[in-house]
Protein backbone atom coordinates (compact mmCIF):
# COMPACT_ATOMS: atom_id res chain seq x y z
CA UNK A 1 0.00 0.00 0.00
CA UNK A 2 1.26 3.49 -0.87
CA UNK A 3 0.28 6.16 1.65
CA UNK A 4 0.68 9.93 1.45
CA UNK A 5 1.35 11.09 5.03
CA UNK A 6 0.53 14.72 5.82
CA UNK A 7 1.32 16.90 8.82
CA UNK A 8 -0.53 20.18 8.29
CA UNK A 9 0.53 23.16 10.38
CA UNK A 10 -1.00 26.64 10.34
CA UNK A 11 1.47 27.88 7.70
CA UNK A 12 3.27 24.69 6.68
CA UNK A 13 2.54 21.25 5.25
CA UNK A 14 5.04 18.41 5.70
CA UNK A 15 4.58 15.31 3.58
CA UNK A 16 6.06 11.85 2.96
CA UNK A 17 5.03 9.28 0.37
CA UNK A 18 5.54 5.89 2.01
CA UNK A 19 5.42 2.36 0.61
CA UNK A 20 4.04 0.44 3.59
CA UNK A 21 5.25 -2.92 2.22
CA UNK A 22 8.91 -1.88 2.38
CA UNK A 23 8.32 0.90 4.98
CA UNK A 24 10.45 3.23 2.86
CA UNK A 25 9.70 6.92 2.24
CA UNK A 26 9.88 7.20 -1.57
CA UNK A 27 9.97 10.99 -1.36
CA UNK A 28 9.27 13.74 1.15
CA UNK A 29 9.10 17.48 1.48
CA UNK A 30 7.58 20.56 3.01
CA UNK A 31 5.41 23.42 1.79
CA UNK A 32 6.28 26.41 3.94
CA UNK A 33 4.97 29.95 4.56
CA UNK A 34 1.45 29.12 3.34
CA UNK A 35 -0.54 32.37 3.06
CA UNK A 36 2.62 34.43 3.66
CA UNK A 37 5.14 36.22 1.43
CA UNK A 38 8.08 34.06 0.27
CA UNK A 39 6.12 30.78 0.18
CA UNK A 40 7.90 27.72 -1.27
CA UNK A 41 7.91 23.94 -1.62
CA UNK A 42 11.03 21.88 -0.88
CA UNK A 43 10.83 18.36 -2.36
CA UNK A 44 13.36 15.55 -1.81
CA UNK A 45 13.78 12.29 -3.71
CA UNK A 46 16.85 10.00 -3.65
CA UNK A 47 18.91 12.72 -1.99
CA UNK A 48 18.06 15.24 -4.72
CA UNK A 49 16.25 18.42 -3.74
CA UNK A 50 13.98 20.78 -5.67
CA UNK A 51 12.94 24.14 -4.22
CA UNK A 52 10.18 26.08 -5.96
CA UNK A 53 8.98 29.51 -4.81
CA UNK A 54 5.49 30.73 -5.68
CA UNK A 55 2.39 32.27 -4.16
CA UNK A 56 0.63 29.69 -1.97
CA UNK A 57 -2.58 31.19 -0.64
CA UNK A 58 -4.03 28.25 1.26
CA UNK A 59 -3.81 24.52 2.00
CA UNK A 60 -5.70 23.62 -1.21
CA UNK A 61 -2.94 25.23 -3.28
CA UNK A 62 -0.34 23.51 -1.07
CA UNK A 63 -1.89 20.05 -1.67
CA UNK A 64 -2.05 20.74 -5.42
CA UNK A 65 1.67 21.58 -5.33
CA UNK A 66 2.49 18.37 -3.46
CA UNK A 67 0.54 16.34 -6.04
CA UNK A 68 2.34 18.15 -8.85
CA UNK A 69 5.67 17.16 -7.28
CA UNK A 70 4.58 13.53 -6.78
CA UNK A 71 3.71 13.25 -10.50
CA UNK A 72 6.57 15.49 -11.74
CA UNK A 73 8.46 14.00 -14.72
CA UNK A 74 11.88 13.99 -13.02
CA UNK A 75 11.27 14.59 -9.31
CA UNK A 76 8.05 12.59 -9.13
CA UNK A 77 7.47 9.05 -7.97
CA UNK A 78 4.06 8.19 -9.51
CA UNK A 79 2.36 8.64 -12.89
CA UNK A 80 -1.15 9.40 -11.64
CA UNK A 81 -3.25 9.91 -8.49
CA UNK A 82 -4.52 6.33 -8.83
CA UNK A 83 -1.22 5.16 -7.36
CA UNK A 84 -2.01 6.89 -4.04
CA UNK A 85 -3.92 4.28 -2.02
CA UNK A 86 -4.72 6.48 0.98
CA UNK A 87 -3.82 9.65 2.83
CA UNK A 88 -2.80 9.51 6.51
CA UNK A 89 -3.14 12.74 8.51
CA UNK A 90 -1.59 13.75 11.80
CA UNK A 91 -4.32 15.33 13.93
CA UNK A 92 -3.13 16.80 17.22
CA UNK A 93 -6.26 16.64 19.41
CA UNK A 94 -8.97 14.02 19.36
CA UNK A 95 -10.33 14.84 22.82
CA UNK A 96 -12.27 11.96 24.37
CA UNK A 97 -13.80 11.09 21.00
CA UNK A 98 -10.97 8.93 19.66
CA UNK A 99 -8.89 6.19 21.28
CA UNK A 100 -7.61 4.96 17.91
CA UNK A 101 -6.99 6.14 14.37
CA UNK A 102 -10.16 6.47 12.27
CA UNK A 103 -11.24 6.64 8.64
CA UNK A 104 -12.45 10.21 8.07
CA UNK A 105 -16.14 10.89 7.44
CA UNK A 106 -18.43 13.84 8.21
CA UNK A 107 -18.89 12.70 11.82
CA UNK A 108 -15.11 12.50 12.36
CA UNK A 109 -14.61 15.98 10.88
CA UNK A 110 -17.33 17.32 13.19
CA UNK A 111 -15.51 15.85 16.22
CA UNK A 112 -12.16 17.30 15.07
CA UNK A 113 -13.92 20.66 14.71
CA UNK A 114 -15.31 20.35 18.25
CA UNK A 115 -11.75 19.83 19.56
CA UNK A 116 -10.52 23.07 17.95
CA UNK A 117 -10.82 25.01 21.20
CA UNK A 118 -8.58 22.39 22.86
CA UNK A 119 -5.91 22.80 20.14
CA UNK A 120 -6.53 26.16 18.45
CA UNK A 121 -3.11 26.25 16.75
CA UNK A 122 -3.16 22.74 15.32
CA UNK A 123 -6.64 21.28 14.74
CA UNK A 124 -7.86 23.94 12.26
CA UNK A 125 -4.77 23.31 10.10
CA UNK A 126 -5.13 19.52 10.41
CA UNK A 127 -8.74 19.84 9.25
CA UNK A 128 -7.74 22.08 6.33
CA UNK A 129 -5.31 19.37 5.22
CA UNK A 130 -8.05 16.73 5.30
CA UNK A 131 -10.55 18.89 3.40
CA UNK A 132 -7.95 19.89 0.80
CA UNK A 133 -7.25 16.19 0.13
CA UNK A 134 -10.96 15.39 -0.17
CA UNK A 135 -11.18 18.10 -2.82
CA UNK A 136 -7.94 17.42 -4.72
CA UNK A 137 -7.77 13.59 -4.40
CA UNK A 138 -11.46 12.59 -4.44
CA UNK A 139 -12.42 8.97 -3.84
CA UNK A 140 -9.32 8.09 -1.80
CA UNK A 141 -9.69 7.24 1.91
CA UNK A 142 -8.36 9.75 4.44
CA UNK A 143 -7.28 8.42 7.84
CA UNK A 144 -6.85 10.61 10.94
CA UNK A 145 -4.16 9.56 13.45
CA UNK A 146 -4.42 11.48 16.73
CA UNK A 147 -1.57 12.58 19.00
CA UNK A 148 -3.91 12.08 21.95
CA UNK A 149 -5.34 8.63 21.07
CA UNK A 150 -2.56 6.48 22.57
CA UNK A 151 -3.07 8.11 25.99
CA UNK A 152 -6.80 7.33 26.14
CA UNK A 153 -5.87 4.17 28.11
CA UNK A 154 -4.78 6.27 31.13
CA UNK A 155 -6.81 5.38 34.24
CA UNK A 156 -9.28 7.97 35.47
CA UNK A 157 -7.30 8.75 38.63
CA UNK A 158 -4.31 9.63 36.43
CA UNK A 159 -6.09 11.88 33.93
CA UNK A 160 -8.49 13.80 36.19
CA UNK A 161 -7.54 17.16 37.74
CA UNK A 162 -8.56 17.89 41.34
CA UNK A 163 -10.98 20.64 40.33
CA UNK A 164 -14.75 20.56 40.95
CA UNK A 165 -16.06 17.54 38.99
CA UNK A 166 -18.63 19.71 37.18
CA UNK A 167 -15.79 21.42 35.28
CA UNK A 168 -14.86 18.07 33.75
CA UNK A 169 -18.48 17.29 32.89
CA UNK A 170 -19.07 20.72 31.36
CA UNK A 171 -15.78 21.39 29.52
CA UNK A 172 -14.00 17.98 29.49
CA UNK A 173 -11.04 19.53 31.33
CA UNK A 174 -8.64 16.65 32.04
CA UNK A 175 -5.18 15.39 31.09
CA UNK A 176 -5.03 14.28 27.44
CA UNK A 177 -1.32 13.94 26.71
CA UNK A 178 0.40 14.36 23.34
CA UNK A 179 3.20 12.88 21.17
CA UNK A 180 1.21 9.63 21.41
CA UNK A 181 2.19 8.48 17.92
CA UNK A 182 5.89 8.85 18.77
CA UNK A 183 5.61 7.21 22.22
CA UNK A 184 3.77 4.25 20.67
CA UNK A 185 6.24 3.88 17.79
CA UNK A 186 9.37 3.85 19.98
CA UNK A 187 7.75 1.45 22.46
CA UNK A 188 7.07 -1.02 19.63
CA UNK A 189 10.63 -0.59 18.29
CA UNK A 190 12.10 -1.13 21.78
CA UNK A 191 10.09 -4.34 22.26
CA UNK A 192 11.31 -5.61 18.86
CA UNK A 193 14.90 -4.79 19.83
CA UNK A 194 14.55 -6.48 23.24
CA UNK A 195 12.85 -9.49 21.57
CA UNK A 196 10.09 -9.42 24.13
CA UNK A 197 6.34 -8.92 23.70
CA UNK A 198 5.32 -5.31 24.31
CA UNK A 199 2.51 -6.70 26.50
CA UNK A 200 5.13 -7.90 29.03
CA UNK A 201 7.17 -4.69 29.32
CA UNK A 202 7.21 -1.66 31.60
CA UNK A 203 8.69 1.25 29.65
CA UNK A 204 9.43 4.94 30.21
CA UNK A 205 9.66 6.82 26.92
CA UNK A 206 11.23 10.29 26.80
CA UNK A 207 10.31 12.28 23.68
CA UNK A 208 12.64 15.26 24.01
CA UNK A 209 12.53 17.95 21.33
CA UNK A 210 11.36 21.55 21.12
CA UNK A 211 8.19 20.13 22.66
CA UNK A 212 8.95 17.37 25.19
CA UNK A 213 7.02 14.74 27.09
CA UNK A 214 7.62 11.58 29.11
CA UNK A 215 5.25 8.61 29.07
CA UNK A 216 4.76 5.60 31.37
CA UNK A 217 3.82 2.54 29.29
CA UNK A 218 2.66 -0.59 31.09
CA UNK A 219 2.19 -3.72 29.01
CA UNK A 220 1.73 -1.73 25.79
CA UNK A 221 -0.67 0.86 27.19
CA UNK A 222 -0.06 4.47 28.22
CA UNK A 223 -0.84 4.80 31.93
CA UNK A 224 0.48 8.34 32.46
CA UNK A 225 2.22 11.13 30.59
CA UNK A 226 3.71 14.51 31.46
CA UNK A 227 1.70 16.77 29.13
CA UNK A 228 -1.82 17.62 30.19
CA UNK A 229 -4.99 19.32 28.97
CA UNK A 230 -2.67 21.07 26.49
CA UNK A 231 0.97 20.51 25.42
CA UNK A 232 2.00 23.24 27.90
CA UNK A 233 2.19 20.97 30.96
CA UNK A 234 5.05 18.83 32.26
CA UNK A 235 8.68 19.38 31.32
CA UNK A 236 10.29 22.76 30.73
CA UNK A 237 10.51 22.96 26.93
CA UNK A 238 12.04 25.11 24.20
CA UNK A 239 9.68 28.05 24.73
CA UNK A 240 6.96 26.49 26.96
CA UNK A 241 7.00 26.81 30.73
CA UNK A 242 5.91 23.28 31.58
CA UNK A 243 4.11 22.77 34.90
CA UNK A 244 4.15 25.74 37.29
CA UNK A 245 2.12 26.72 40.34
CA UNK A 246 -1.15 28.06 38.81
CA UNK A 247 -1.18 30.91 41.35
CA UNK A 248 1.91 32.36 39.62
CA UNK A 249 -0.27 33.04 36.56
CA UNK A 250 -2.87 34.98 38.58
CA UNK A 251 -0.16 36.89 40.43
CA UNK A 252 1.66 37.88 37.22
CA UNK A 253 -1.52 38.85 35.38
CA UNK A 254 -2.31 41.25 38.19
CA UNK A 255 1.23 42.63 38.58
CA UNK A 256 2.00 43.00 34.86
CA UNK A 257 -1.59 43.89 33.82
CA UNK A 258 -1.61 41.01 31.31
CA UNK A 259 -4.72 39.75 29.54
CA UNK A 260 -5.40 36.07 28.71
CA UNK A 261 -3.85 36.27 25.23
CA UNK A 262 -0.68 37.92 26.56
CA UNK A 263 -0.37 35.31 29.30
CA UNK A 264 -0.91 32.52 26.76
CA UNK A 265 1.94 33.94 24.64
CA UNK A 266 4.10 34.40 27.74
CA UNK A 267 3.72 30.75 28.80
CA UNK A 268 3.86 29.18 25.32
CA UNK A 269 6.36 31.31 23.42
CA UNK A 270 8.55 33.22 25.88
CA UNK A 271 9.16 30.71 28.68
CA UNK A 272 10.95 27.36 28.92
CA UNK A 273 14.69 27.20 28.34
CA UNK A 274 14.48 30.31 26.15
CA UNK A 275 12.97 32.32 29.01
CA UNK A 276 15.45 31.02 31.59
CA UNK A 277 18.57 31.41 29.43
CA UNK A 278 17.66 34.54 27.49
CA UNK A 279 19.79 32.93 24.76
CA UNK A 280 17.85 30.41 22.69
CA UNK A 281 15.35 27.56 22.67
CA UNK A 282 17.91 25.43 20.78
CA UNK A 283 20.03 23.18 22.99
CA UNK A 284 23.05 23.45 20.66
CA UNK A 285 23.10 27.21 21.29
CA UNK A 286 22.57 26.67 25.02
CA UNK A 287 25.49 24.24 25.27
CA UNK A 288 27.77 26.63 23.39
CA UNK A 289 26.75 29.53 25.66
CA UNK A 290 27.13 27.39 28.80
CA UNK A 291 30.62 26.31 27.70
CA UNK A 292 31.48 30.00 27.31
CA UNK A 293 30.48 30.60 30.93
CA UNK A 294 26.86 31.74 30.53
CA UNK A 295 25.32 30.77 33.88
CA UNK A 296 21.70 31.21 32.78
CA UNK A 297 22.23 28.90 29.80
CA UNK A 298 23.70 26.30 32.18
CA UNK A 299 20.76 26.78 34.54
CA UNK A 300 18.28 26.19 31.69
CA UNK A 301 20.00 22.90 30.76
CA UNK A 302 20.13 21.81 34.42
CA UNK A 303 16.44 22.61 34.98
CA UNK A 304 15.38 20.71 31.85
CA UNK A 305 17.35 17.58 32.79
CA UNK A 306 16.26 17.73 36.44
CA UNK A 307 12.61 17.59 35.38
CA UNK A 308 13.17 14.67 32.99
CA UNK A 309 14.92 12.80 35.80
CA UNK A 310 12.04 13.53 38.20
CA UNK A 311 9.54 12.07 35.74
CA UNK A 312 11.68 8.96 35.27
CA UNK A 313 11.61 8.39 39.05
CA UNK A 314 7.91 9.19 39.29
CA UNK A 315 6.97 6.83 36.47
CA UNK A 316 9.18 4.02 37.80
CA UNK A 317 7.05 4.26 40.95
CA UNK A 318 3.80 4.35 38.94
CA UNK A 319 4.84 1.29 36.90
CA UNK A 320 6.20 -0.63 39.90
CA UNK A 321 9.59 -1.03 38.25
CA UNK A 322 10.90 -0.49 34.74
CA UNK A 323 12.39 -2.72 32.02
CA UNK A 324 13.70 0.03 29.74
CA UNK A 325 14.10 3.80 29.54
CA UNK A 326 13.92 5.15 25.98
CA UNK A 327 15.20 8.45 24.59
CA UNK A 328 13.85 9.79 21.30
CA UNK A 329 13.24 12.92 19.17
CA UNK A 330 15.68 15.76 18.36
CA UNK A 331 17.26 16.20 21.80
CA UNK A 332 16.69 12.65 23.05
CA UNK A 333 18.42 11.11 20.02
CA UNK A 334 21.20 13.65 19.47
CA UNK A 335 22.14 15.31 22.76
CA UNK A 336 24.54 13.15 24.79
CA UNK A 337 24.99 15.82 27.49
CA UNK A 338 21.24 15.94 28.24
CA UNK A 339 21.01 12.13 28.40
CA UNK A 340 24.08 12.07 30.67
CA UNK A 341 22.48 14.48 33.16
CA UNK A 342 19.17 12.58 33.10
CA UNK A 343 20.79 9.18 33.72
CA UNK A 344 23.43 9.94 36.37
CA UNK A 345 22.78 8.50 39.87
CA UNK A 346 19.97 6.13 38.88
CA UNK A 347 21.86 3.04 40.12
CA UNK A 348 19.32 2.64 42.96
CA UNK A 349 16.73 1.90 40.23
CA UNK A 350 18.92 -0.75 38.59
CA UNK A 351 20.12 1.62 35.85
CA UNK A 352 23.82 1.05 35.17
CA UNK A 353 24.44 3.60 32.48
CA UNK A 354 27.49 3.39 30.16
CA UNK A 355 28.86 6.92 29.79
CA UNK A 356 31.30 6.03 27.03
CA UNK A 357 28.60 4.46 24.84
CA UNK A 358 26.35 7.47 25.45
CA UNK A 359 28.94 9.83 24.01
CA UNK A 360 29.71 7.52 21.05
CA UNK A 361 26.29 6.67 19.66
CA UNK A 362 25.75 5.00 16.27
CA UNK A 363 23.04 7.17 14.70
CA UNK A 364 19.96 6.01 12.83
CA UNK A 365 19.33 2.75 14.70
CA UNK A 366 18.27 1.46 18.12
CA UNK A 367 21.35 1.87 20.33
CA UNK A 368 21.90 0.58 23.87
CA UNK A 369 23.69 2.88 26.34
CA UNK A 370 23.56 0.72 29.48
CA UNK A 371 26.25 -1.58 30.85
CA UNK A 372 25.72 -5.31 30.10
CA UNK A 373 24.94 -6.07 33.77
CA UNK A 374 22.29 -3.30 34.05
CA UNK A 375 18.87 -4.58 35.15
CA UNK A 376 17.22 -1.73 33.23
CA UNK A 377 17.97 -1.24 29.54
CA UNK A 378 18.59 2.33 28.34
CA UNK A 379 17.88 2.74 24.63
CA UNK A 380 18.11 5.50 22.05
CA UNK A 381 15.34 4.84 19.53
CA UNK A 382 14.98 7.13 16.48
CA UNK A 383 11.32 8.10 16.20
CA UNK A 384 9.38 7.99 12.94
CA UNK A 385 5.92 9.46 13.38
CA UNK A 386 5.27 9.51 9.61
CA UNK A 387 5.92 5.77 9.31
CA UNK A 388 3.68 5.13 12.32
CA UNK A 389 0.88 7.14 10.65
CA UNK A 390 1.36 5.11 7.44
CA UNK A 391 1.24 1.85 9.46
CA UNK A 392 -1.94 2.93 11.27
CA UNK A 393 -3.51 3.89 7.92
CA UNK A 394 -2.68 0.48 6.44
CA UNK A 395 -3.93 -1.36 9.56
CA UNK A 396 -7.28 0.43 9.49
CA UNK A 397 -7.86 0.00 5.77
CA UNK A 398 -6.83 -3.68 5.84
CA UNK A 399 -9.53 -4.56 8.37
Curated annotation (Swiss-Prot):
Residues that coordinate or bind substrate: 90
Any GO BP: acetate metabolic process
Active site, renumbered: 147 (proton donor/acceptor)
Named cofactor requirement(s): Mg(2+); Mn(2+)
Cofactor note: Mg(2+). Can also accept Mn(2+).
InterPro entries tied to this protein: Ac/propionate_kinase, Aliphatic_acid_kin_short-chain, Aliphatic_acid_kinase_CS, ATPase_NBD
Keyword Kinase: yes
Residues that, per the record, bind Mg(2+): 7, 385
Gene Ontology, cellular component aspect: cytoplasm
Pfam family, one: Acetate_kinase
Binding site for ATP: 14, 207-211, 282-284, 330-334
One term of GO molecular function: ATP binding
Catalytic reaction(s) noted: acetate + ATP = acetyl phosphate + ADP
Site feature Transition state stabilizer, where: 179, 240
Subcellular location: Cytoplasm
Broad class of enzyme this protein falls into: transferase
Pathway linked to the protein: Metabolic intermediate biosynthesis; acetyl-CoA biosynthesis; acetyl-CoA from acetate: step 1/2
UniProt similarity note: Belongs to the acetokinase family.
Function per UniProt: Catalyzes the formation of acetyl phosphate from acetate and ATP. Can also catalyze the reverse reaction.
Protein name per Swiss-Prot or TrEMBL: Acetate kinase
Species assigned in the record: Caldicellulosiruptor bescii (strain ATCC BAA-1888 / DSM 6725 / KCTC 15123 / Z-1320)
